[in-house]
């Protein structure tokens, strides 16, 4: 991979992202990549490379700060807990990453999107919920925990890509999210992949007891759905 580690800040907290901007004669759309509950890792950095192949600049972000990675289920749970409980913290951390992204040389600051996986999928939804406007947000097998913040008018287009057998998401949470997005006047899509568990895009996921299982077909289909969505939202800018 041809990217580099970059430091950016949320207040005084130093965050360590991974950035790659393909060579181009014009400024490129930027796609931010939100990480799983483990923290920013090679998985997200590989998504940066895959997004480069689609013609986009990409930045995998660091929501925890300091490049921290959890080493166990217990550590991962402890890392996400402050963000689940404090959505203002969550939103501010995300907005700081987006604002940094807008300053990157070679990036078209009017064309920004956020995609995320698992905890990062919730991050994509939470940024849309905040009312902060970017071109689009995409959630891959995201957690769907409801926010403690009041509904805002959602100004960002949202695509949610979900595994129908994901044990970490209840049917009530799905309905609540859909109702919330409709009430918030969002432009939203929700795609559910049959016979598909949590973490279906991660080839390393193989724990059926935990409900995290890679699914090749759903991985390919969801990436295609994301690609089509990004092409749409970036082409609609300024129209």
Labelled PLM ranges:
Residues 1-239:
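N-terminal cap/leader regions of alpha/beta-hydrolase-fold enzymes
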